[in-house]
C-alpha cells in the first residue's frame, strides 16, 4: 500500500513539500512524491524530494536566557506567561500567523516559561505555587502533564542548548533547581547562589554536549561594598554567580562595578557636605541594581539594570539611571564598559524626550552584534550594537531621524523579549496590557507589525480593573490619562519628566523595595516595601500604618509630591479644569490629598487606583523557612518573652497605625512628624557619616525616633538594615541593647547570643502565613 500527499505552498518555495506523519508507522511521507510501504520497509521512489525535507531543529541557535515568553528553535511556536491569570498562552507564529492555539491553566503566578528546542514540551515557573508545570504541547489539546515541586517562589527558567536540562531560579529560596527534561524530575538543588536569583543565561558552544556550558545567575539586589558609605553613589555592586553545567555547582562570581560618571550633574553633594547651589556642577555616579536579566553575545554577557544614584540633593535626573553592564566571559570580570543609556537620550530635542526607564531585559540577534533592550516603564524597546572585542555597547539612533534614539513602541509595561533564529522577528511580552508585540527586524527602522492579545483584562468597572489600573500607573514613567473633554487627545507624561522615573523604579514592579539608602530631605532613608502599608487580613483594607520612617506622611496620595519633586512629573492632582496641576499639595495640611480632583484612566481616578493597588495588589514575599523548625519555634517564644510585639505585633507586624482621619490637627504633628507613632530605640546616631539631609539646609529627622518597621517578609530584604543601613545583619540589629530591651522597660533578656540567633531565625521565617502576635 502507499500514501500520496499533495504539494502545498511553504516558505521554502511554491513547490516545497510538506512533511506529515503517517499515522500507521509514525514515519514521514514527503510532498507529492510517493513512499511505498511493504512490511514496514520504506522505499524512496523520488529521491529528489529530500531537498524539501525540514528536519526538526533540536538545538537552540545561540545562548539561551530566561524570559516570560519562549520560542521553539524553529521559531514556529511561542509560549507567553500570563502571571495575573495563572495561565500560559500558546501561539502559532509561523509565517506571521500569530494565532492563539491554546491556553493552559498552570500554577499560581507563572512568571517564567521555556520550551524544548524541538517543541513538544513547554515549562512554566509558577511563583506562588512553588512549582514548575510541564506542558504537553498538542495543538488545541495542550495540557499540563506533570507538576514538579521546586523551591520557594520559582521565577525564571532556562534550558541548556540541546534542551537536556532545565534550570529554575527560586527567587525567595535563593536556590537553583536542576531538572532533567527526560524524566522531568529535580536532580539537584544548588543552594549557595546568593539572595534572590532572578536572571538566567546559558552559554552555547554549538555541540551536542550540554555539560560543557556555564550558567550565569543574576542576584536581583546589589551588594554593599564594605569599604563604602551606604547612601553614596558607589556604595554597592551588582553580582552574578557562575555555575558549571557539568557539576551543577557554583564555580565563581562576578561583581559589576558602579559607574563613576552617569553623565548627569547635581547641584551639590550631600555625602561630601557640599550644600546645594543653583548650578549643576557635581558629577554623579550609579551602581547596578535590580538585575532582572542577563544575555550573552560572543565573549560577553550583558546585564541591564536600574542604576541607583542615591546621594543628594534630589533632582529628577540624578536618582535612577539606565545601565547596561558587560561581563568578560574569558576573564570572568566586569569588562568595565558599563554605559548609561539615558545619556543617549539627553541630547534629544524637547519636548519629545523619552528616557529608557527600568531596563528590564534584553535579547540579541543571532547573526549580528545587535541587541534590543526592553524599557519596562517607558513602553519601548531600544536597539544597541556591541563591540565583540571590547564589550562596549552603543545605543542606536533612528535611521529616519538621527537626532533621536530609535524607540520601538510596544504595549504597556514590556517585560520580556525573544528573537527568532532567522533574525526576522522579535516578540515582546507586555505585562500590563496582557499582549505581545511582533517586531519586524528586517525593516529599517524596526517596527511593530502586530499586537496580539494573550489574556483578558479585568472587567471594566470591577475592583480588579481598578487595581489593574493602579498597577499600570505604578509601573509607568509616562501614564496615559483620559482627556477632560471626550474627543480631545489623551493627557500623557504626568508621572515623570521626560519619562524618567516610576514608582516601580524604586519599589520594583512588585511594590517592594530596591534596598537602597537614599539621601532624602528627611535624611538617609532605605526604601520601604509597600506590602505592609495596609492590613492584608482586613478585607476592607481600612487599617493603614503611617508612612515613612519619620511618620511624616499620612496618606498614600501624599506621594504626589514624589511624582513632582523626585521624578519631575506634573502629577495627578488637578484643578477644576481637570488638567492644570493643583499646586496646593502638602503633607498633612491644610487639605487631605485623598479624593481630590484627579486625572482619570478609563474613567477611574488615578490616585484611587494607585491606592487600590497598594492596598490589594502587592503580595508579601514567601519565606523559605518553615514555621515548625525548632529554632524558629524557640525564637518566637523568646520574641514574645522580650515583648518585641509591643512595637512589632499585629497583622502588619508593626504597631504603627493611622489613628485619625486626615488632615490631622496641628497638635498631632509637631516638627512635621506624627510623634505618637515614633519610638526611640537607639537607632539614631547623629554622628553617622551618612546621617545628613539632602540639601544640608537643616538637621535630618531622627531625634524623635522612628515608626516601628514591619517584620512581615523581612527575609526578602537583605541587609544592611535600619533607616540608614548601619547594621549588616539582623544579629547586628539585635546587638543594640536599647533596641532589644525596648519592650521590657530596659531589662535586657537577650544577652545570650544563641537566643538572639533563634530570634533572627524566627524573624526570617515570618510571612503572610505566620499567625500574627497580638
For each feature predicted by the language model, list its residue ranges.
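N-terminal secretory signal peptides that target proteins for export/translocation
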Residues: 1-32
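Prokaryotic Sec-type signal peptides and long signal-anchor helices
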Residues: 6-9, 28-29, 40-43, 94, ...
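Positively charged, low-complexity intrinsically disordered regions
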Residues: 9-11, 34-35, 52, 199, ...
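Alpha-helical and His/Cys-centered functional microenvironments
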Residues: 12-14, 37, 71
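Bacterial N-terminal signal peptides
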Residues: 37-51
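Predominantly soluble domains enriched in secretory-pathway, periplasmic, or organellar proteins
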Residues: 52-479
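Periplasmic c-type cytochrome electron-transfer domains
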Residues: 222, 263-265, 290-774
Amino acid at each position: 500500500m502507499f500514501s500520496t500527499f499533495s504539494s502545498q505552498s511553504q516558505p521554502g518555495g511554491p513547490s516545497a513539500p510538506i512533511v506529515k506523519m503517517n499515522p500507521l508507522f509514525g514515519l514521514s511521507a514527503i510532498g507529492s512524491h510517493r513512499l511505498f510501504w511493504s512490511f514496514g520497509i520504506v522505499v524512496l521512489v523520488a529521491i529528489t524530494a529530500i531537498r524539501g525535507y525540514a528536519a526538526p531543529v533540536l538545538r537552540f541557535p545561540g545562548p539561551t536566557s530566561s524570559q516570560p515568553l519562549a520560542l521553539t528553535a524553529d521559531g514556529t511556536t511561542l509560549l507567553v506567561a500570563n502571571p495575573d491569570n495563572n495561565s500560559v498562552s500558546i501561539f502559532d507564529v509561523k509565517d506571521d500567523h500569530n494565532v492563539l492555539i491554546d491556553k493552559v491553566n498552570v500554577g499560581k503566578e507563572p512568571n517564567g516559561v521555556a520550551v524544548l528546542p524541538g517543541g513538544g514540551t513547554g515549562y512554566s515557573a509558577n511563583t506562588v505555587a512553588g512549582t514548575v508545570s510541564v506542558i504537553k504541547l498538542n495543538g488545541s489539546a495542550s495540557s499540563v502533564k506533570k507538576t514538579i515541586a521546586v523551591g520557594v517562589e520559582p521565577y525564571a527558567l532556562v534550558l541548556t542548548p540541546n534542551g537536556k536540562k532545565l534550570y529554575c531560579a527560586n527567587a525567595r529560596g535563593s536556590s537553583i533547581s536542576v531538572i532533567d527534561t527526560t524524566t522531568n524530575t529535580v536532580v539537584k538543588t544548588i543552594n549557595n547562589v546568593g539572595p534572590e536569583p532572578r536572571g538566567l543565561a546559558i552559554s552555547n558552544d554549538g555541540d551536542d554536549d550540554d555539560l560543557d556550558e556555564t550558567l550565569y545567575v543574576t542576584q536581583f539586589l546589589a551588594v554593599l561594598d564594605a569599604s563604602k558609605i551606604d547612601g553614596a553613589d558607589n556604595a554597592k555592586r551588582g553580582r552574578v554567580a557562575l555555575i558549571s553545567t557539568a557539576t551543577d555547582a557554583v564555580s565563581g562570581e562576578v561583581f559589576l562595578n558602579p559607574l563613576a560618571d552617569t553623565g548627569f550633574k547635581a547641584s551639590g553633594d550631600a555625602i561630601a557636605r557640599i550644600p546645594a547651589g543653583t548650578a549643576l556642577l557635581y558629577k554623579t555616579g550609579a551602581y547596578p541594581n535590580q538585575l532582572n536579566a542577563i544575555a550573552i553575545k560572543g565573549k560577553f554577557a550583558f546585564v541591564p539594570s536600574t542604576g541607583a544614584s542615591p546621594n543628594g540633593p534630589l533632582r529628577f535626573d540624578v536618582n535612577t539611571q539606565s545601565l547596561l553592564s558587560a561581563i568578560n566571559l574569558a576573564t570572568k570580570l566586569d569588562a568595565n564598559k558599563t554605559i548609561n543609556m539615558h545619556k543617549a537620550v539627553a541630547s534629544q530635542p524637547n519636548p519629545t524626550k523619552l528616557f529608557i526607564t527600568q531596563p528590564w531585559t534584553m535579547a540579541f540577534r543571532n547573526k549580528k552584534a545587535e541587541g534590543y533592550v526592553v524599557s519596562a516603564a517607558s513602553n519601548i524597546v531600544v536597539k544597541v550594537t556591541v563591540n565583540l572585542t571590547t564589550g562596549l555597547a552603543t545605543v542606536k539612533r533612528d535611521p529616519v531621524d538621527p537626532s533621536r534614539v530609535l524607540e520601538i513602541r510596544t504595549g504597556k509595561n514590556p517585560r520580556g523579549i525573544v528573537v527568532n533564529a532567522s533574525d526576522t522577528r522579535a516578540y515582546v511580552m507586555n505585562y500590563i496590557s496582557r499582549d505581545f508585540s511582533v517586531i519586524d527586524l528586517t525593516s529599517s527602522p524596526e517596527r511593530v507589525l502586530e499586537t496580539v492579545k494573550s489574556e483578558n483584562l479585568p472587567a471594566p468597572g470591577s475592583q480588579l480593573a481598578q487595581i489593574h489600573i493602579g498597577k499600570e500607573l505604578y509601573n509607568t514613567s509616562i501614564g496615559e490619562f483620559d482627556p477632560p473633554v471626550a474627543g480631545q487627545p489623551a493627557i500623557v507624561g504626568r508621572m515623570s519628566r521626560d519619562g524618567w522615573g516610576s514608582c516601580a523604579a524604586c519599589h520594583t514592579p512588585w511594590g517592594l523595595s530596591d534596598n537602597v539608602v537614599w539621601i532624602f530631605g528627611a535624611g538617609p532613608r532605605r526604601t520601604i516595601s509597600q506590602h505592609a502599608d495596609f492590613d492584608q487580613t482586613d478585607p476592607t483594607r481600612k487599617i493603614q500604618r503611617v508612612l515613612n520612617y519619620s511618620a511624616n506622611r499620612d496618606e498614600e496620595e501624599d506621594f504626589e509630591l514624589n511624582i513632582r519633586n523626585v521624578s519631575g512629573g506634573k502629577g495627578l492632582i488637578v484643578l477644576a479644569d481637570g488638567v492644570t496641576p493643583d499646586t496646593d499639595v502638602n503633607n498633612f495640611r491644610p487639605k487631605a490629598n485623598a479624593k481630590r480632583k484627579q486625572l482619570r484612566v478609563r474613567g477611574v481616578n488615578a490616585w484611587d487606583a494607585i491606592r487600590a493597588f497598594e492596598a490589594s495588589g502587592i503580595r508579601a514575599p514567601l519565606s523559605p523557612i518553615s514555621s515548625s523548625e525548632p529554632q524558629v519555634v524557640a525564637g518566637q517564644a523568646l520574641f514574645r518573652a522580650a515583648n518585641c510585639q509591643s512595637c512589632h505585633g499585629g497583622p502588619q507586624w508593626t504597631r504603627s497605625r493611622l489613628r485619625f482621619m486626615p488632615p490631622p490637627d496641628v497638635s498631632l504633628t509637631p516638627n512635621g512628624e506624627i510623634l505618637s507613632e515614633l519610638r526611640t530605640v537607639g537607632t539614631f546616631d547623629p554622628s553617622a557619616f551618612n546621617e545628613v539631609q539632602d540639601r544640608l539646609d537643616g538637621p535630618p529627622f531622627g531625634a524623635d525616633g522612628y515608626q516601628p518597621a514591619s517584620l512581615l517578609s523581612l527575609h526578602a530584604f537583605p541587609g544592611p538594615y535600619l533607616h540608614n543601613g548601619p547594621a549588616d545583619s539582623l544579629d547586628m540589629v539585635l546587638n543594640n541593647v536599647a533596641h532589644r530591651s525596648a519592650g521590657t522597660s530596659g531589662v535586657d533578656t537577650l544577652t545570650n547570643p544563641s537566643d538572639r540567633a533563634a530570634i533572627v531565625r524566627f524573624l526570617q521565617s515570618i510571612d503572610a502565613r505566620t499567625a500574627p502576635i497580638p
